[in-house]
């Protein structure tokens, strides 16, 4: 236990900062069960080291995700709540439902739902601990190999990765399953055994029960070898990104679109990499090699009068004004509106960023109206007209969006600053002539 705790503490100390909340993905299986005990011990040690008897100064919380797939799930949730209470760690249960008729694998659906549920508990800077270990790493590597993945996929799992504004950390990634089980038994811990883990119809279980024992018996150092290969692949990926970073920054536009003109100056291999970097930045799933070719040949190079698009899993790649855009399904926000106060960031709906009417800007372009309390923000351009300072007369917003080259799918996603029934400014596009001045600036900070 001491050796394993020491490794756990070393990993945690690489990422933990005072005031950070730690969230444990707690399934009740042996991996997360042991993590709960390690986290509880770390919490107590932290309180002693910081001369505090208040264990809550070290903020941690466990989350059990109830998928509803097993008749035992309610019992498992109850056990997790009890174990967490005994460990002195708060715990909550998140219930999710899966669309088992979607055609997707149950494994993938459960994984996506699980991480969506966990993301609700993560705020900026928080840590999410998960229980993946060295055997999981080998399985992930072999599954990527089976899919024909390149270096990115073969990099498998990193010790840490960005997640929901915080960081996902895998403290047990260098530890074998047999060592985890041995320590758990040594400590007298109980844990849940998910019956689905024995079902070899699932690829990961097939590898775990049929393939891994054979590999480990033939090559006892297979775990270290796979970890080394995965690490080398990850290094190659990082090097490629580093070498192409300057090119990528030139191609990436302020609205997160990608310049086709810039892409066209590079080789096919470089173009494919730049598109992958772009989609990764936008948190989209990576396309296949076939899809990468389609993005270039059938979207980027389509006839100029065409409106090409390629549907991928989480959204679609579209072309507009010689740029590639990543378009996800959007929620209608045209009924949303809110008052706005000067020098106070207004959080916009559906991750559309934040809006600030700043009176401290050196680039002020707006005259403050006589009754600032009547200022409001809307997203509905229907029936509205405006007279931009750069235009000779007033026009409907629908026409102005066309003139300002705003893609059709973004026109109801741009915040409009209103004063009573008059348009003051539209996003970062223009200010109406009637409100032109030097009192304040409308600053729109967009989210990815």
Curated annotation (Swiss-Prot):
Name of the protein this chain belongs to: tRNA(Ile)-lysidine synthase
Family: Belongs to the tRNA(Ile)-lysidine synthase family.
GO biological process: tRNA modification
GO CC terms in record: cytoplasm
UniProt keyword terms in alphabetical order: ATP-binding, Cytoplasm, Ligase, Nucleotide-binding, tRNA processing
Organism whose genome encodes this protein: Vibrio campbellii (strain ATCC BAA-1116)
Cytoplasm recorded as keyword: yes
Single Gene Ontology MF annotation: ATP binding
Domain commentary: The N-terminal region contains the highly conserved SGGXDS motif, predicted to be a P-loop motif involved in ATP binding.
Annotated binding of ATP, by residue: 27-32
Pfam families to which the protein is assigned, alphabetical: ATP_bind_3 (PF01171), TilS (PF09179), TilS_C (PF11734)
Catalytic reactions of this protein: cytidine(34) in tRNA(Ile2) + L-lysine + ATP = lysidine(34) in tRNA(Ile2) + AMP + diphosphate + H(+)
SUPFAM superfamilies (UniProt xref): Adenine nucleotide alpha hydrolases-like, MesJ substrate recognition domain-like, PheT/TilS domain
CDD domains, alphabetized: TilS_N
Job of this protein: Ligates lysine onto the cytidine present at position 34 of the AUA codon-specific tRNA(Ile) that contains the anticodon CAU, in an ATP-dependent manner. Cytidine is converted to lysidine, thus changing the amino acid specificity of the tRNA from methionine to isoleucine.
Subcellular location per the Swiss-Prot or TrEMBL entry: Cytoplasm
Enzyme Commission designation: 6.3.4.19
Calcium recorded as keyword: no
């Amino acid at each position: 236990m001491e050796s394993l705790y020491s490794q756990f503490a070393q990993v945690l100390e690489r990422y933990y900062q005072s005031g950070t909340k730690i969230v444990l993905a707690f399934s009740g299986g042996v991996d997360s069960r042991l993590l709960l005990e390690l986290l509880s011990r770390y919490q107590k040690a932290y309180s002693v080291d910081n001369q505090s008897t208040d264990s809550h100064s070290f903020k941690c919380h466990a989350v059990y995700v109830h998928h509803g797939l097993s008749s035992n799930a309610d019992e498992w949730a109850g056990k997790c709540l009890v174990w967490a209470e005994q460990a002195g760690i708060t715990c909550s249960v998140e219930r999710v439902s899966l669309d088992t008729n979607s055609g997707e694998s149950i494994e993938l659906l459960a994984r996506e739902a699980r991480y969506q549920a966990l993301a609700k508990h993560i705020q900026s800077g928080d840590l999410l601990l998960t229980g993946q270990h060295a055997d999981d790493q080998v399985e992930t590597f072999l599954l990527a190999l089976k899919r024909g993945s390149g270096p990115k996929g073969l990099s498998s799992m990193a010790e840490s990765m960005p997640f929901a504004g915080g960081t996902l950390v895998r403290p047990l990634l260098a530890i074998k399953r047999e060592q985890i089980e041995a320590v758990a038994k040594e400590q007298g811990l109980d844990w849940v055994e998910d019956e689905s883990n024995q079902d070899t119809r699932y690829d990961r279980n097939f590898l775990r029960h049929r393939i891994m024992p054979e590999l480990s018996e033939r090559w006892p150092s297979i775990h270290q070898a796979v970890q080394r290969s995965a690490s080398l692949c990850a290094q190659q990926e990082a090097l490629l990104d580093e070498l192409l970073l300057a090119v990528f920054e030139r191609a990436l536009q302020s609205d997160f679109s990608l310049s086709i003109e810039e892409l066209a100056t590079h080789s096919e291999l470089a173009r494919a990499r730049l598109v992958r970097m772009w989609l990764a930045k936008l948190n989209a799933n990576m396309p296949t090699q076939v899809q990468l070719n389609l993005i270039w040949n059938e979207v980027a190079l389509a006839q100029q009068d065409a409106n090409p698009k390629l549907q991928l899993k989480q959204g679609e790649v579209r072309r507009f004004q010689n740029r590639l855009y990543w378009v996800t399904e959007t929620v209608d926000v045209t009924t949303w509106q809110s008052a706005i106060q000067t020098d106070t960031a207004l959080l916009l709906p559906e991750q559309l960023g934040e809006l600030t009417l700043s009176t401290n800007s050196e680039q002020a372009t707006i005259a403050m109206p006589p009754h600032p309390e009547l200022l409001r923000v809307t997203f509905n351009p229907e029936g509205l007209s405006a007279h931009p300072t750069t235009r000779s007369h007033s026009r409907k917003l629908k026409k102005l969006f066309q003139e300002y080259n705003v893609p059709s799918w973004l026109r109801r996603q741009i915040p409009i600053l209103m004063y009573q029934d008059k348009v003051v400014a539209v996003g970062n596009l223009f200010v109406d002539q009637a409100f032109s001045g030097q009192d304040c600036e409308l600053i729109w900070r967009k989210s990815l």
